Amino acid sequence: MIRQCRAGLRLCRALYQTSYRWHGKSACERALRYAPGESIHGFTVNEVTPVPELFLTAVKLSHDNTGAKYLHVAREDSNNLFSVQFRTTPLDSTGVPHILEHTVLCGSQKYPCRDPFFKMLNRSLSTFMNAFTASDYTMYPFSTQNAKDFQNLLSVYLDAVFFPCLRELDFWQEGWRLEHENPEDPNSPLIFKGIVFNEMKGAFTDNEKVFSQHLQNKLLPDHTYSVVSGGEPLNIPDLTWEQLKQFHATHYHPSNARFFTYGNLPLEIHLKQIHEDALSKFERIDPKTSVPPQERWQSPREYSISCGTDSFASDPEKQTTVSVNFLLSEITDTFEAFTLSLLSSLMVDGPNSPFYKALIEANLGTDFSPDTGFNNYTRETYFSIGLQGINKEDSEKVKAIINKTINEVAEHGIEAERIEALLHKLEIQMKHQSTSFGLTLASYVASCWNHEGDPVDLLKIGDKISRFRECLKENPKFLQDKVKQYFQVSQHRMTLSMSPDEQHYDKEAQLEAEKLTQKVKALSEEERKQIYEKGLELIRLQSKPQDASCLPALKVSDIEPKIPLTDLDITYAGDVPVQYCAQPTNGMVYFRAVSSLNTLPEELKPYVPLFCSVITKLGCGVYNYREQAQQMELTTGGMSVCPHIITDDSNLDTYEQGVVFSSLCLDRNLPDMMHLWSEIFNSPHFDDEERLRVLVRMSAQEMSNGIPDSGHVYASIRAGRTLTPAGELQELFSGMDQVKMIKRIAEMPEMGPILRKLSRIRKYVLLSDNMRCSVNATPQQMPVASKEIEHFLAGISRSKKERKSIRPHVVEKSSSPSSSGSEISRRATRKLVGDPTFKPCQMKTHFSLSFPVNYIGECVRTVPYTHPDYASLRILARIMTAKFLHGEIREKGGAYGGGAKLSFDGIFGFYSYRDPNSLSTLSTFQKAADWAKSGQFTQQDVDEAKLSVFSAVDSPIAPSDKGMNHFLHGISDEMKQKHREQLFAVTHSDLTNASNKYLTAGQCTRGTAILGPENRNIAKDPSWIIR
């Protein structure tokens, strides 16, 4: 990684000798040498501002000819990011900005090949590539650690957004079209097709999405926020190709653009390329895309909408959602918005907040309503508060509670200790280093900057915290005054309620059918003929091999041959192995521990995920659950627990099962954090039925709401269930089985039996037996951390008697980070369990859900991580996705997404997402295997697949996560280097051999699962299990 970056620096020096600021200086130092008024490649520097609390320097510029705005954030970070965003303000719900976002990425003047965006995924080492359509802007970001790659991607992105082809057939494919159900049969019925059309149909199966969309439309009804920028499925077929091209001409202009770059590459190089490749070809215009302020109401308003029923609701009679919404300040008033965001957090976050106490614990609903809290994605910010999972008759009660709570906060204010806890949380957020910090910043400033706000002022979080403290000091009722101003005096207040309608999806289907009939009836014979011919033309185009030679590409030789090594020190605290990893963590300490589940009785296993979810939220030691939450907020950045299932790296029938404990804190708070863990381990509370009931209902609601967004994940977990012993446990812990179990628990009248099961689990898990720990911190902090870990481990219990593993076949594997590790590190072992008698079997499951689209997973058992064929299968999955499945499933089939992947557990999986098809997609999966076996791909395709795989292998790792591959998965640097060498060595014949060996129908064991609407063909097939 370091060598790769240095190679990039040498390239930059060779190309741009004029970049004098680049030589021998840090990114921030170089940026500070710019002067306001200085001209650089057609741009003028407007402002240079150091922001020390975020270790960055911001340089604000504008383009002389076009007025394009530019923000460069210089930071010593090799994961460099580019983004360009346009203010896109549609006035109808045809989805024109969303369809345009898709279509500009389908080919451009310099790169006329079809789909350069997806092709660049395989010609680059990008760490991120995507595009987003928000309510009022469209953003195109990418990031990479390679300087040459940055220039390649920048060239493609600039040409895509400013000089796209916008071909009619691309509009048909990406947006919508009328096409015969079977495009080759003119007698088959005409239907609506299109990627965005199907994507939005899938999006609106999510009731939370439906609610959020209506909330914004109705609270801000005067301009662009009154429409669906992503597209309302019934309105999408009203968009014409001409309208799409016109929207591009008026909105995708440099005068309406905001450029953002981040990282340690020199600014001059970016400016030169952007000016020469794009901006020099334009003159300034007035884009007329500004959003006027919403006219404030004179009296509150109320609305009611309907949605689909939730088959996973814990109480079918309680499926109503109600919220009260308040329009707040302009987003460009950055301090006011900052203050209101803090006030919102204080009012709704955690069990000590007024609204949590008043609403969540009122036993009326399951969770807060969607969008609860502060929303700053529109020109004017807003606050939303409400409940979901309530009885419709309780709507008035909820509204009354909201009013009462607002009045109480206005009168009594917020406790000082809670304010300190929130400011502590902000301090941690500023110190914590993520690998995608550039993308985080680009997204953070996007909305405010979009409305002419100052993005640099937004970054000065330290200044805002100081000013906030000063305001509180000068006026102790500062926050109470804000509550009165925005929640009591203001009349711009909207109440929205949503209730299920059993006929909702039928009505949607009927309206779509009527729209279709209307469109078809209006067709002349000549137009019908053209539709048939265009359908055939689109298939020919989609099936035609693409020449992508016009696109820039890295070579496999650009990939660094060796991995950077991570120094790990493994010692013992008593008989517990502890991994120490010294890193520049910026004054933070990261603690993890793994506790084995090997001795846990089988009947308690299904309750492990619930145990993990609630163990840090029930109270412990001297703290009740409210006090515990307050202590966690005051002294930590969070404490979490989750199940841990890791398949062995050399045997698919062996796996580690456990629970992972994770937390982080500032250096100064390490003793307090470890004290909290001691209290949780030694004295957890399992005596509050009402508290558990609240947590279970929230968990059940969250799982149910997550299915429309993660349906393909649930399908894939289910499909892999019968292929390995770990797969069975994965389904139990994270699959549809867990969703249904939590739903059943939420329906139970008494929580006592569940509390007793959780208390029993504690006796097997919250012990130092079969535990290992890890710490990531600065070298200076390590001696203190070591003492605290030793003190913690010495103070927690051990089993009073030796417990045997429930599964008799136990495998001990060394935890040493290298074969030449110290004697102490070689003592450390991980205890895995195996089932030598396990026999994988085939199973096909269909979960019949009231969705208009399908989520599909098909899995094949292959080989473990260290097997020589694992590298071939990993590259095979990428080549099948890029060269076959993307075209068949997305372009031809109209699904939002689909592909193949190889997971660490040796499961080769096919999947599709928001897919209008079901059984035909399963046929496509088999065709993909046949295509791979036939070897219909080139050496160039193999090299591109390697680039794509290495972009994931070499993705940046934050200081907090260094060494985690070894600690959690048992993967050492030596093993990673060997795998790397195997990836480099994969040949064309290796891929065809792997396809024949592992993907041949009848020779491999497969699991299949579909989540989606009723299917008559599946219902008639006895080989399917229908749930």
From Swiss-Prot:
Activity control: Mainly exists in a closed and catalytically competent conformation but a closed-to-open switch allows substrate entry into the catalytic chamber. Substrate binding induces closure and dimerization. A disulfide bond may lock the enzyme in a closed conformation preventing substrate entry into the catalytic chamber, participating in redox regulation of the enzyme. Inhibited by metal-chelating agents. Inhibited by nickel and zinc excess, and slightly activated by manganese.
MF GO annotations: metal ion binding; metalloendopeptidase activity
Subcellular location: Mitochondrion matrix
Name of a matching Pfam family: PreP_C
Family: Belongs to the peptidase M16 family. PreP subfamily.
PTM description: A disulfide bond locks the enzyme in the closed conformation preventing substrate entry into the catalytic chamber.
Composition skew (Low complexity), residue ranges: 814-823
Binding site for Zn(2+): H98, H102, E199
Manner of cofactor binding, per the entry note: Binds 1 zinc ion per subunit.
Designated name of the protein: Presequence protease, mitochondrial
Keywords on record: Disulfide bond, Hydrolase, Metal-binding, Metalloprotease, Mitochondrion, Protease, Transit peptide, Zinc
A single GO cellular-component term on record: mitochondrial matrix
Superkingdom assignment: Eukaryota
Signal peptide positions on this chain: none
Subunit structure, as described in the record: Monomer and homodimer; homodimerization is induced by binding of the substrate.
Job description of the protein: Metalloendopeptidase of the mitochondrial matrix that functions in peptide cleavage and degradation rather than in protein processing. Has an ATP-independent activity. Specifically cleaves peptides in the range of 5 to 65 residues. Shows a preference for cleavage after small polar residues and before basic residues, but without any positional preference. Degrades the transit peptides of mitochondrial proteins after their cleavage. Also degrades other unstructured peptides.
Main location: mitochondrion
One GO biological process term: proteolysis
InterPro entries attached to this UniProt entry: Metalloenz_LuxS/M16, Pept_M16_N, Peptidase_M16_C, Peptidase_M16C_assoc, PreP_C
